[in-house]
Amino acid sequence: SFAKVEYWDKLCEGIDKAEQELFSYNVEVERMCFNQYDKSSFDELIPRIEEANCQGVVIATQFHDSVVKLASRLDQLQIPYILIDAFIENTNCVAYYGTNSYDSGYIAGRLLYEQINPTENIAIFRFIRKGEMQVTQVMKREEGFRNYLAEKNYDGRIYSVQLHADEPEKNINILNAFLEEHKEVNAGIIFNSRAHLLGKYFRDKGERFRLIGYDVIDPNITCLNDGSITHLIAQRPEVQGFNCIRALFRHL
């Protein structure tokens, strides 16, 4: 499941375009959606995919262990699959479409480091998930981010701010409490496309906060233009979605 302004909406636009172009070849894409903040909803799809009688699968790699389980089952059934969003090792995927998560986090570390002093405290904002603490891609991005700072001998403190996927009022209270307690923090990062939610919060508060986010979606671009987001790291999800369907078609 996704909101219409998110990375996944853009990715589906690319999938739709590829399906339309391959219509004359009798290519049909069946979408099976899950809650990206609830691992159990992904797990519930696995038996449905096994029974779907499909010739190929595109897997969004939100939950590492569940993706490995599904990939293993598809290997047994001899059904080819493509991974999208984050690469998972020890799978036999036909192809992977997405950015190098570690490298993008490393770049994000450089972008933020250039805006702060080496002892300045910063924040990492996260949206809480059910069933698995972090998605594979986010973990790799954060690893790259932290490693860059470590290489630069960054000596500040990195705070973790846990937010809730569908509770905006609760999030405002969490952010208010955090900033009240840590008035010195005015720089941070979020490793997904929801940077605009934070950008809007800081804009409405009149706070000058140096924020880095991911994905060039319209609300994020608005925040980038008004200065409530300082940098965005782009993935071009519509191209990823298009290419994964085309690649699976060529393989078959």
Task: Give the role of each language-model region.
Residues S1-E44:
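Amphipathic helical "hinge" segments at domain boundaries
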Residues S1-L11, V94-A95, N121-E132:
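Short beta-strand segments enriched in small/hydrophobic residues
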Residues W8-D16, D43, Y102, Y106, ...:
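Short, surface-exposed alpha-helical segments at coil->helix boundaries
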Residues E44, G56-D75, R157-I221:
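Hydrophobic alpha-helical
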Residues S66-D103, I217-I229:
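Flexible loop/hinge segments that line or gate small-molecule binding clefts
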Residues Y96-A123, N171-I172, N220, R236-L252:
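Hydrophobic alpha-helical segments within soluble ligand-binding/sensing domains
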Residues A108-K152, L248:
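An alpha-beta-alpha
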Residues R203-L252:
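Flexible loop/turn connectors
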